[in-house]
Amino acid sequence: MGTSTDSLSIIKLNNQYYLYYTGRNLPAYKIGLAVSQDGINFTKYSGNPVLINDQSWELSGVGEGTIQNENGILKMYYMNSLETGFGIATSTNGINWTKSNLNPFFTTSSTYNNWAGDHVSYPSVVKVNNEVRLYYCGDGPSTYEHRIGMVRKLSN
């Protein structure tokens, strides 16, 4: 899948390692999966891609996914190819993903004082105590100086 790859996220599920990566096969980016028993030797999943750009806001692709396991529900946070928003998809098996109907849940206009007015990219989610934090890169407006932003959300 794709002519090159970018960004990855690895989780351990059912005694296997699942590696999610962005496959760059222009004109559209997609998220693919490779699986390993030992975390060293990976085999591409034959049903790739596991996440495609099928919503209007996703434009020419999806990528840079990061995965969280919350009580057996996998959550993938990903961005669109033009770096204008983030989406979320859920799965119970790591292969079949359901996108939220609230996507994009975060966009460039969601940032404080619009400081990332041009791009938001590379979402990374960390749970600290009872708080879920979304870290991301942002730049703008029109400066192209990468900055790190954070969004806090209390868990239920």
Features from the language model and the residues they span:
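Carbohydrate-active catalytic/glycan-binding domains of CAZyme proteins
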Residues: M1-N156
